[in-house]
Regions:
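Sequence-structural signature of mature extracellular/luminal beta-sheet repeat domains
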Residues: 1-80
Length: 80
């Protein structure tokens, strides 16, 4: 059978940054109880977006925070 698509290319991924310990607080929230079956959680990150300076913004839905991650990998809370 003819396949016009190239074979998938394996790309090796590596960790660029992870949430600093000072922002981790494993606990129950109004969000985590129904969404994570009453398990305590540290965060639930989603909604990545970049600005023109290369900062990455992500939303912590569980704790109602927005983080900014600089191109150097430094984390700040922008909204809480």
């Amino acid at each position: 059978m003819f396949n016009p698509f190239k074979q998938l290319e394996l790309i090796k991924a590596e960790v660029w940054t992870s949430m600093p310990q000072k922002f981790r607080n494993k606990s129950h929230t109004k969000w985590s109880d129904p969404n994570r079956q009453n398990l305590p959680i540290e965060c639930f990150l989603e909604g990545p977006a970049f600005d023109r300076q290369g900062n990455l913004f992500i939303v912590d839905t569980a704790f109602q925070r927005i983080f900014r991650i600089t191109p150097q990998g430094e984390w700040d809370v922008v909204v809480q």
